[in-house]
């Protein structure tokens, strides 16, 4: 899962990712459990004061809606996977939260109210430069006031940050935030920029106390699939524009994987990118409303394909970093335009405009490698 074990004073002999007698091959892994079964089975590791947090979200959104603001639920940063109920050791997804923080800034500047589900300790809106300095040269910050965007104080009135650390906290908070944001209807965006763990240890399979480093000859773990909640988001907030992310290392499967997420989970758009240039290029994939559905010319995708998988019935918007300091500014602006284009009253006009485009542009899209 692109993860590392963060464990002081522990020896980890194997975190198996290859097939073995104890660990099934990836293709043989059991399907993720039903999301509601996951929530019902998690009692001790759910967020504290969840009901109070929901009330905060409801109150914040009600106030911003009285001001007729559009709203976005934005997730940012990585999630941890605890290995014990009384957690000492955990698996962590690497994510600085920079993309989420900087996209939050753009949504705020565009007049949106933002509910920010962020990893505690990750980058934060209007403070990314300060965090970078803190990591690179902390002594240089001593004796200096913290730099801040001139308009940040005013903009943050429209920001509600809620922190998480574990995969359990993230999924519970995501469900409540989606249900809360539904009050905004089509004026809502769900922007899923968090780096969410793919595998986890269920609560009922965890050690209750710290795993003793000398009790065994090393440590072997079998992880379960994290339930996929993308399909549930459209149940919790059916009128919101849902934007997810897809990162791959093989350019030949990227478009097919992005289109597959639209087909399988019903998301409205997928920000697709490749690992080697994700800071410089993102392609937003969405379904072409004038095409006769999305068609992917492939069966099972193995990840080792040497030729691009043809995909039809999608529209693409290529976002390049260009002269911007990061790609996140033009990326967020493109999502804002997409949301505006789908507003009531604009959808029909946009469809008529799209009808005038050449069919080859409407029916086929291939993100650059």
Give the residues covered by each predicted segment:
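Low-complexity, disordered terminal segments
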Residues: 1-4
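A cross-family phosphate/adenosyl-ligand binding-site feature
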Residues: 9-19, 24-369
